[in-house]
């Protein structure tokens, strides 16, 4: 699945995402509560000459978990190694990474909830006591050797913290949840990105793009690039409110930040199931979509913005959705 409002990175975005990524806490707009706490924790660890406690960053995709991990490493003056859970298939894969870490390095694991159980459990002693057991040989000749690791900080990023086993989750001394950004923070991000990308944009244009960006910086930056194209071809090169409205309407992003799939979800619940409640598996089957995709990609924003409610009996359309999005049909 690839959509312009997708929070996960899509193919080809890595290079310009890195260009736009803040390198310091001071350049990171939004998430003030999380940011201020991390600054204190990092400063205290540096003062003691220790590695920072292990950090778990939770929240929907595109909110800055990877960026914060890099800022933590930069602020600590530490090396960072980056990987993702699907790339760590076996204990040996993890052992190779852990044994290569320098003192006080940061190890970032994206999608950490997708680690297999045996790999997850292999991290326990590494996180608590900085050692792992390495098995050499096979069969009756196999023996276990204790390998001491350099002190390090594990930073895990997850969109589904509830899937982590409690013993694993409890080993993170710092657990923070990132929230969707407000429009002012997104406007600041857009103005900064426009300056880096050399895009002419006025305040009203930035506000309009921010309003439709689903509270997600990655989406905001992606929309900025597409609106820039319309400004260059259909306008005078400046991203104004008028050109932003025109471009985003052409891209199928409405005034609420919803796209066609979002509206299909809402219409399905309202029209086919009388507003709900309806189970997530039923919705997934009706839309020919994966349950995980609905729960991780679409639902967080729809719930956050008050379009649907999640109940024990299923999903329910809210009065706000009926009087806004669905009233515009």
UniProtKB/Swiss-Prot annotation:
InterPro entries: AAA+_ATPase, AAA_lid_4, DNA_helicase_Holl-junc_RuvB, P-loop_NTPase, RuvB-like_N, RuvB_C, WH-like_DNA-bd_sf, WH_DNA-bd_sf. Mg(2+) binds at residue 66. The keyword Nucleotide-binding applies. One of its GO terms (biological process) is DNA recombination. Its EC number is 3.6.4.-. DNA binds at residues 291, 310, 315. Its main location: cytoplasm. The keyword Transcription does not apply. Pfam families: AAA_lid_4, RuvB_C, RuvB_N. Residues 182-252 are annotated as: Small ATPAse domain (RuvB-S). GO terms for cellular component: cytoplasm; Holliday junction resolvase complex. It comes from the Bacteria. Residues 1-20 are annotated as: Disordered. GO terms for molecular function: ATP binding; ATP hydrolysis activity; four-way junction DNA binding; four-way junction helicase activity. It is found in: Cytoplasm. Residues 11-20 have a biased composition (Basic and acidic residues). Residues 255-329 are annotated as: Head domain (RuvB-H). Has 3 domains, the large (RuvB-L) and small ATPase (RuvB-S) domains and the C-terminal head (RuvB-H) domain. The head domain binds DNA, while the ATPase domains jointly bind ATP, ADP or are empty depending on the state of the subunit in the translocation cycle. During a single DNA translocation step the structure of each domain remains the same, but their relative positions change. The RuvA-RuvB-RuvC complex processes Holliday junction (HJ) DNA during genetic recombination and DNA repair, while the RuvA-RuvB complex plays an important role in the rescue of blocked DNA replication forks via replication fork reversal (RFR). RuvA specifically binds to HJ cruciform DNA, conferring on it an open structure. The RuvB hexamer acts as an ATP-dependent pump, pulling dsDNA into and through the RuvAB complex. RuvB forms 2 homohexamers on either side of HJ DNA bound by 1 or 2 RuvA tetramers; 4 subunits per hexamer contact DNA at a time. Homohexamer. Forms an RuvA(8)-RuvB(12)-Holliday junction (HJ) complex. HJ DNA is sandwiched between 2 RuvA tetramers; dsDNA enters through RuvA and exits via RuvB. An RuvB hexamer assembles on each DNA strand where it exits the tetramer. Each RuvB hexamer is contacted by two RuvA subunits (via domain III) on 2 adjacent RuvB subunits; this complex drives branch migration. In the full resolvosome a probable DNA-RuvA(4)-RuvB(12)-RuvC(2) complex forms which resolves the HJ. HAMAP family: DNA_HJ_migration_RuvB. This is Holliday junction branch migration complex subunit RuvB.
């Amino acid at each position: 699945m690839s959509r312009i409002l997708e929070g996960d990175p899509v193919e080809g975005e890595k290079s310009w995402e890195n260009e736009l990524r803040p390198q310091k806490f001071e350049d990171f707009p939004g998430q003030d509560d999380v940011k201020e706490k991390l600054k204190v924790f990092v400063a205290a660890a540096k003062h003691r000459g220790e590695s920072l406690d292990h950090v778990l960053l939770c929240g929907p995709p595109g909110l800055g978990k990877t960026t914060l991990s890099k800022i933590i490493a930069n602020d600590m003056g530490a090396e960072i190694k980056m990987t993702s859970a699907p790339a760590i298939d076996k204990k040996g894969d993890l052992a190779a990474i852990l044994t290569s870490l320098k003192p006080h390095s940061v190890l970032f694991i994206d999608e950490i909830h997708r680690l297999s159980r045996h790999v997850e459990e292999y991290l326990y002693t590494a996180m608590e006591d900085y050692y792992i057991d390495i098995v050499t040989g096979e069969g009756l000749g196999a023996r276990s050797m204790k390998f001491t690791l350099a002190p390090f900080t594990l930073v895990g990023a997850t969109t589904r913290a509830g899937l982590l086993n409690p013993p694993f989750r409890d080993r993170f001394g710092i657990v923070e949840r990132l929230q969707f950004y407000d429009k002012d923070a997104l406007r600041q991000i857009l103005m900064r990105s426009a300056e880096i990308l050399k895009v002419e944009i006025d305040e009203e244009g930035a506000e309009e793009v921010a309003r439709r960006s689903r509270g997600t910086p990655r989406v905001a930056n992606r929309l900025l690039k597409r609106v820039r194209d319309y400004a260059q071809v259909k306008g005078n090169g400046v991203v104004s409110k008028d050109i932003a409205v025109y471009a985003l309407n052409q891209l199928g992003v409405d005034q609420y930040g919803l796209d066609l799939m979002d509206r299909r979800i809402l219409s399905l619940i309202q029209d086919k199931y009388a507003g709900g409640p309806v189970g997530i598996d039923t919705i997934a089957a009706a839309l020919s979509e994966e349950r995980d995709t609905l729960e991780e990609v679409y639902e967080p924003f729809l719930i956050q913005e008050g379009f649907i409610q999640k109940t024990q009996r299923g999903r329910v359309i809210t009065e706000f959705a009926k009087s806004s999005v669905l009233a515009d049909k």
